[in-house]
């Protein structure tokens, strides 16, 4: 049975975990809200000082660069920690539709996330943002009476150039 679960896992990874370097241009507020940076929210960040492990501000000539670093957090939710600034995975999102397969005991461990944001000195506007947040996904896969604990790592990297 582990071979069947392995095959399903590989299929799911091939389907959902892809490198996508295509640039997209978002112009409407609705399009931007669906993608940047926490899809479906009408806010960009709800970070508090307690959510951030470290912060650095650098003068980059015509821009200021702010780098925020994050520690380790398990199952972020309620718009705190990683969920205050990143589109995090939850159990209802990681649920593949395969006949006879069910997933339980999902655990999402985020670690060493970073946000790098650059702001124009002239306007104060955000001109670029880079989001990088690794996660270890652990879950139990149930298939035809077999239970297999699965662990996989992935990193989400998003780059946004902002034009006004």
Name each model feature, range by range.
Residues 1-164:
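Subset-of-secretome marker
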């Amino acid at each position: 049975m582990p071979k069947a679960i392995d095959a399903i896992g590989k299929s799911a990874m091939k389907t959902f975990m892809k490198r996508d370097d295509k640039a997209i241009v978002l112009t409407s507020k609705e399009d931007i809200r669906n993608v940047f940076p926490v899809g479906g929210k009408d806010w960009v960040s709800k970070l508090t000082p307690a959510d951030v492990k470290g912060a650095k501000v650098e003068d980059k000539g015509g821009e200021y660069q702010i780098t925020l670093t994050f520690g380790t957090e398990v199952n972020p939710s309620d718009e705190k920690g990683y969920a205050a600034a990143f589109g995090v995975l939850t159990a209802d999102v990681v649920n593949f539709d395969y006949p006879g397969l069910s997933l339980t005991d999902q655990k999402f461990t985020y670690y060493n996330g970073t946000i790098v944001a650059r702001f124009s000195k002239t306007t104060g506007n955000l001109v670029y943002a880079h989001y990088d947040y690794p996660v270890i996904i652990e879950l139990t896969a149930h298939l035809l009476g077999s239970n297999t604990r699965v662990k996989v790592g992935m990193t989400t990297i998003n780059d946004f150039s902002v034009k006004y």
